[in-house]
Amino acid sequence: MPKVGIIFNDDKPTACSVAQELQEQLQQSGFTVAMETGSGGLLGYSQPDRPICHTRIEHLTPPHFDESMPFAIVLGGDGTVLSAFRQLAPLGIPLLTINTGHMGFLTEIYLNQLPTAIEQLINGDYQIESRSMMTVRLMREENLLWEALSLNEMVLHREPLTSMCHFEIQVGYHASVDIAADGIIVSTPTGSTAYSLSAGGPVVTPDVPVFQLAPICPHSLASRALVFSDLEPVTIFPATPNRMVLVVDGNGGCYVLPEDRVHLSKSPYPAKFIRLQTPEFFRILREKLGWGLPHIAKPTSVELP
């Protein structure tokens, strides 16, 4: 029998109950179903007085999931989707993402669309959209201390109650630049609608092969977001005496010391989204973030006295 998977947010009763119902439905349709919670993809935070908690990228793959799976289903919000791709992107499994959370910017459908969606899924009536991911590595001399896959962004910022930071940043083999700021964000196109957007970065459509660097509260009028090819690796050298905090996808990370460096590159593992209709990014921007909506109602759209 073909094998498929379900990853769900076990902190949400709705996701748990729907996961159980889906498991039974898929088993009745002739599938073997592997179940896993989204917590398996959580990175966790390293404490400053303890050794760095390092889990290799390939070691996040849950048991009983493998490359033979034609698809897996994710039940949760955006955090669960990010966690699921950290777990399954190395296996190349396409994911149908179902929103049981709040905004669900990365999810494909809502629960009320589930019956039709499962029918399409079983019949193979869908497209696959591939989105680039980023590999984040923390190096000390030549030693790998920590690594993670990122679908959204890497953030390197100062600790609370410390002063502004300086960063030496080298993109590809170009001359390095110095940025003075509270922190920096390096994001994928998918992450351009997340933290980077709040920091003043532009929205980048998912099909554009770029990375984006955005400073957080820079101390210069000349420091602005930069968009560059994702074929260019990025190396960040902390040029400040204080330790910093590295966070990936708002989920977890570790402390970065002045002698460390952060290396970013395009991941060989894409995130494969199952699309039940033709992807329309601008519709999602309008629906989820209110992009392009009029600020003032037009006379023809309101009832005039």
UniProtKB/Swiss-Prot annotation:
Stretches assigned to coiled coil: none
Cofactor(s) required, per the database record: a divalent metal cation
Any one GO biological process: NADP biosynthetic process
Loss of function: phenotype: Insertion mutant shows a slight decrease in NADK activity compared to the wild-type. Under photoheterotrophic conditions, mutation does not affect growth rate. Under photoautotrophic conditions, the growth curves of the wild-type parent and the mutant do not show any differences, but mutant shows large differences in NAD(P)(H) levels along with massive changes in metabolite profile. Mutant exhibits a fast-growth phenotype under light-activated heterotrophic growth conditions and light and dark cycle conditions in the presence of glucose.
Keywords: ATP-binding, Cytoplasm, Kinase, NAD, NADP, Nucleotide-binding, Transferase
Binding annotation for NAD(+): D78, G79, N152, E153, D182, T193, A194, Y195, S196, L197, S198, N251
Signal peptide: none
Matching SUPFAM superfamilies: NAD kinase/diacylglycerol kinase-like (SSF111331)
Catalytic activity field: NAD(+) + ATP = ADP + NADP(+) + H(+)
GO molecular function: ATP binding; metal ion binding; NAD binding; NAD+ kinase activity
Gene induction: Expression decreases after transfer to photoheterotrophic conditions.
Gene3D superfamilies for the chain: Probable inorganic polyphosphate/atp-NAD kinase, domain 1, Probable inorganic polyphosphate/atp-NAD kinase, domain 2
InterPro entries membership: ATP-NAD_kinase_N, ATP-NAD_kinase_PpnK-typ_C, NAD/diacylglycerol_kinase_sf, NADK
Domain of life of the native organism: Bacteria
Main subcellular location of this protein, as a coarse class: cytoplasm
Top class in the EC scheme: transferase
Positions annotated as active site in the UniProt record: D78
EC number of the protein: 2.7.1.23
A Gene Ontology term for the protein's cellular component: cytoplasm
Recorded family membership: Belongs to the NAD kinase family.
Anything else known: NADK activity derived from sll1415 makes probably a larger contribution to total cellular NADK activity than activity derived from slr0400. Slr0400 cannot functionally replace sll1415 under photoheterotrophic conditions.
Primary role: Involved in the regulation of the intracellular balance of NAD and NADP, and is a key enzyme in the biosynthesis of NADP. Catalyzes specifically the phosphorylation on 2'-hydroxyl of the adenosine moiety of NAD to yield NADP. Functions as a growth repressor under light-activated heterotrophic growth conditions and light and dark cycle conditions in the presence of glucose. NADP(H)/NAD(H) maintenance by slr0400 probably plays a significant role in modulating glycolysis and the TCA cycle to repress the growth rate and maintain the photosynthetic capacity.
Protein name in UniProt: NAD kinase 2
Species classification: Bacteria, Bacillati, Cyanobacteriota, Cyanophyceae, Synechococcales
